Amino acid sequence: MVHLTPEEKAAVAALWGKVNVDEVGGEALGRLLVVYPWTQRFFESFGDLSTPAAVMGNPKVKAHGKKVLGAFSDGLAHLDNLKGTFAQLSELHCDKLHVDPENFRLLGNVLVCVLARNFGKEFTPQVQAAFQKVVAGVATALAHKYH
């Protein structure tokens, strides 16, 4: 559960309504794979991830980034039940994929940076603070199965 004020909820919803999930998802996942190269081991089937340009131009990275942000959008619609919303994904990432739950926090922080880059002055300190709460809540929900 994420505790947001009505103003924070409105700010998150307003900005998220402008997000191009296809582009931002691919950029966020791509940046995660470039900045934290050890995360690439979970995506060996994606083909060439040998250079930043290869990662950022990889269609499988873009497609999976879109999928990730689609799930994130579902979370935004269920901020009062993030653990329930992400229960199956938490189980998948824990039991089958064996993803270090710290990677969820890293991706959330990368997403915040990508939003800041894409929205500039619209991404005010107040909007940033609200999104930090949201990505922290999503990361906690995704890590729930690990506990």
From Swiss-Prot:
One GO cellular component, as annotated: blood microparticle
Keyword tRNA processing: no
Keywords: Heme, Iron, Metal-binding, Oxygen transport, Transport
Chain ranges passing through the membrane: none
CDD domains named in the record: Hb-beta-like
Record-stated family: Belongs to the globin family.
Protein name: Hemoglobin subunit delta
